[in-house]
Amino acid sequence: MKIEKIYEDNDIIVVYKPAGIATQTARLTEPDMETMVRNEVKKPVFLIHRLDQPVEGVLLFAKSKEAAAGLEKQLQNGQIEKYYLAVVNGDLEEPVLRLDNYIKKTKENKSVICEKSDKDAKKASLIVKKLADQTNAENKKTLVGIHLLTGRHHQIRVQMSGIGHSLVGDKKYGTIKDNEGALKLCNYCLIFKHPTNNKTITVKYWPEFAKEYINEAPVLDF
């Protein structure tokens, strides 16, 4: 499988991760993005963030330990901006909505919304913006932009399901009726400082599912 490069220089490489491909895997018989990128650049690479296997979109790697350290520091300090595109079930009443919850991971590899006082509870925050909807659809669906403010396990899927707008195709957090093909979730845009020259880097991938709702790639700056 040939990887799709979005950006590359001497210090970093950004690629598109298709839905269904693991970011990393311990199974030798399964393809994963880390191995494919390492084979492409013919040197060790350092994964900066992860995407769940059903999720598509932008994936960032460093080509050296020094570059990785700089990017990981930005990630830990919340300085890497992450914007997602998703299709959710239903119609959002508010054009822009901020969600703040506490969530925790379960033994079944799921996450649930919980109380702040619960053991292992972690703060989860994001901002959702309505972009377009299918007004003639029998079951209304809405394209949204999501600014991910914290990076928790299955965060977007859990929080959107929690307000009654599960992601289309979400077999874990949606209802049986929601199981329509692939999960409609894409890591659309990353904004970060280059680890060597400190210039602002913006990388994007516009997914096919979004093109059914809008004609050009959106500018997400909320």
State what each model feature region is.
Residues 1-123, 129-135, 206, 212-219:
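RNA pseudouridine synthases
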Residues 144-147:
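Short histidine-centered loop motifs in beta-beta connectors
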Residues 113, 155, 201-202:
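A sequence-level detector of short linear motifs
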Residues 65, 149-150:
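Loop/turn elements at beta-strand to alpha-helix junctions within RNA-recognition modules
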Residues 139-142:
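Trp-centered recognition loops
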Residues 71, 152-160:
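Short beta-strand segments enriched for Tyr within beta-sheet-rich domains
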Residues 108, 150, 196-197:
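Residue-level recognition of short loop/turn positions
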Residues 1-12, 18-23, 137, 159-222:
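Pseudouridine synthases involved in rRNA/tRNA modification
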